[in-house]
Swiss-Prot record:
Residues 36-118 form the GS beta-grasp domain. SUPFAM superfamilies: Glutamine synthetase, N-terminal domain, Glutamine synthetase/guanido kinase. Belongs to the glutamine synthetase family. It comes from Chlamydomonas reinhardtii (Chlamydomonas smithii). PROSITE patterns: GLNA_1, GLNA_ATP, GS_BETA_GRASP, GS_CATALYTIC. Irreversibly inhibited by the herbicide L-phosphinothricin (PPT). It catalyses: L-glutamate + NH4(+) + ATP = L-glutamine + ADP + phosphate + H(+). It comes from the Eukaryota. This is Glutamine synthetase cytosolic isozyme.
Length: 382
């Protein structure tokens, strides 16, 4: 199935891209002198909590840390994050990445969002107040409290590529289904490894940007892929995961395909998409007591199972059915090397008496700030 055409005005799959990207590539490759200035692409989470927004500004100096960057604002009424009569939302830079699209000294900036600054009676500025969709703020507070425990994370981000016109998985027969699952996971070859170009370009661009991406593989559902981000410590997990998604959206824009983070994109006897979250602390990584600490963590996670499930991704009930390598949504379980459990512990952890474990409950549309905050709260702070 062709993936070449996209756009609100396109109705025929054979229509080419509305914009000729070869022209864009020509000029971007030949025009390299920016007269000592750089482009900074400010990136933030939009009002749906799934979309990622961005806009650019020109800087005269190259920042070395987020604090060197100016705060900015945007029209929150156009992103579902503010009313029209008081529409300004403020952006505070938090993490800097290289811009793999523009190259050179240009940068991508992960930001979080705040209400406009308020002035105290004494004329000083009050501390910025996060808007409701700013989940990074609470996560940063929790990670600061737990930093002595050195929480490490690695998230497995599954996604499905869709034809931008039909909204059907890339490479699937129009209005039909491919052969059953089996030949697609970690596959190679035409007809089974569908969408590798997208996965490979995304992989390389994340590396170039400085996103701590650690691997890529084709998944069980045809046109479904996974990439892994981590290990990342504390708040950096959320920053790197959200920037990796921004880069994915940009790559799919270039290929005129859509990416879906829906946890069950195709109903029926097909695998869903997860955001399995691997986790360890200094205590779990230290033998011989690490294995005991992991078991204590599992007991704590069981006690707050309902709290975690409620925040682990919209539509997750369609995925967590106890089938297709998932646990039951209503029941907590953990086990060694068991992919049908809520928590999977690696085979060597009981042997080595230390290590990490995998929370398999989060959906592919997870908010990494929310999931990592909850895990640390439950296992360390409560």
């Amino acid at each position: 199935m062709a993936a070449g055409s996209v756009g609100v005005f396109a109705t025929d799959e054979k229509i080419g891209s509305l914009l000729d990207q070869s022209i864009t590539r020509h000029f971007l490759s030949t025009v390299t002198d920016q007269q000592g200035k750089i482009c900074a692409e400010y990136v933030w989470i939009g009002g749906s909590m799934h979309d990622v927004r961005s806009k650019s500004r020109t800087l005269s100096t190259i920042p070395t840390k987020p604090e060197d960057l100016p705060h900015w604002n945007y029209d929150g009424s156009s992103t579902g994050q503010a009313p029209g009569h008081d529409s300004e939302v403020y952006l505070i830079p938090r993490s800097i990445f290289k811009d793999p699209f523009r190259g050179g000294d240009n940068i991508l900036v992960m930001c979080d969002c705040y209400e406009p600054p308020k002035v105290n009676p004494d004329g000083t500025l009050a501390a910025p107040k996060p808007i409701p969709t700013n989940t990074r703020f609470a996560c940063a507070e929790v990670m600061e409290k737990a930093k002595k425990e050195e929480p490490w994370f690695g998230i497995e981000q599954e996604y499905t590529l869709l034809n931008a016109i039909t909204k059907w998985p890339l490479g699937w027969p129009k209005g039909g289904y491919p052969a059953p699952q089996g030949p697609y996971y970690c596959s190679a070859g035409a007809g089974v490894a569908i969408g590798r170009d997208v996965a490979e370009v995304h992989y390389r661009l994340c590396l170039a940007a400085g996103v701590n991406i650690s691997g890529v593989n084709a998944e069980v559902l045809p046109s479904q892929w996974e990439y892994q981000v981590g290990p990342c410590e504390g708040i950096t997990m959320g920053d790197h995961m959200w920037m990796s998604r921004y880069i994915m959206y940009r790559v799919c824009e270039m290929f005129n395909v859509e990416v879906s983070f829906d946890p069950k994109p195709i109903p029926g006897d097909w695998n869903g998409s997860g955001g399995h979250t691997n986790y360890s602390t200094k205590a779990t990584r230290t033998a011989p007591d690490g294995w005991k600490v992991i078991q204590e963590h599992c007991a704590k996670l069981e006690a707050r199972h309902a709290v975690h499930i409620a925040a682990y991704g919209e539509g997750n009930e369609r995925r967590l059915t106890g089938k297709h390598e998932t646990s039951s949504m209503s029941d907590f379980s953990w086990g060694v090397a068991n992919r049908g459990c809520s928590i999977r512990v690696g085979r060597m952890v009981p042997v080595e008496k230390s290590g990490y474990y995998e929370d398999r409950r989060p959906a592919s549309n997870l908010d990494a700030y929310v999931v990592t905050r909850l895990i640390v709260e439950t296992t360390i702070l409560l």
